[in-house]
Amino acid sequence: MADSNPHPNEDSLELVDGSRVAVIGGGPAGSFTSYFLLEMAERADLEIEVEIYEPRDFSCVAPGGCNMCGGIISETLVQNLAAEGINLPDTVVQRGIESYVLHMDVGTVRIETPIDEKRIAAVYRGAGPRDIQVRKWGSFDHHLEGLAVARGAKVTRGRVTEISMDNGRPSIAVKGGEPQAYDLLVAAFGVNSPALKLFKELDFGYEPPETTKTFIREYFM
């Protein structure tokens, strides 16, 4: 029986034909990683497998389809993506924002953008609020995930519940599923993800970053 591990050297950090990559997190970080990794592999004439693990379906309305994060990005990012051939539709990029307003107990402060040309863009992270009647926009996260899939990535709708090492290779499993071994594991989840605990339990010195609690609220307009 042929060895399923494409690497004859367990200590190799180089991806080769047949290498398998797991990306935990299907938000922008995970989708961008998958998209550009597959693009670079194509340029290098490598055939690799990329699998994104994401429990949320970003095409769904209500909290179940939202990453629970504010949809604010720099327009520089939008322009850089366009230079890479990735054009975000108007249904995803809602509008440009000229300033922030900081409300405090001692008063209100308006924070203008430092350079007029470098505006801030608002995007929709989910597909819409729970009681939406007509969908007028698309999800930023769903759009990016779709680009990664079009590049060749596979999406598994499930929450990773186990991470271990199998003969020097990372192995992960979702609830009710069999462990899957990979050659590279990418952690592309947020600081609130329970996957942080799984990495800490691997006992290789990882410590979750310090965080500050933030309350984020969206208003339907």
Could you describe each region identified by the protein language model?
Residues 29, 58, 192:
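Conserved Rossmann-like nucleotide-cofactor binding loop
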Residues 69-72, 117-146, 194:
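Short beta-strand to alpha-helix junction loop
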Residues 36-39, 146-221:
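Predominantly flavin-linked oxidoreductase catalytic cores and closely associated redox partners
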Residues 57-108:
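N-terminal FAD cofactor-binding segment of flavoenzymes
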Residues 76-83, 91, 138-154:
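N-terminal Rossmann-like dinucleotide/flavin-binding domain of flavoprotein oxidoreductases
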Residues 11-29, 51-53:
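Beta1/beta-strand and adjacent pyrophosphate-binding region of the FAD-binding site
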Residues 38-66:
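Glycine-rich FAD pyrophosphate-binding loop
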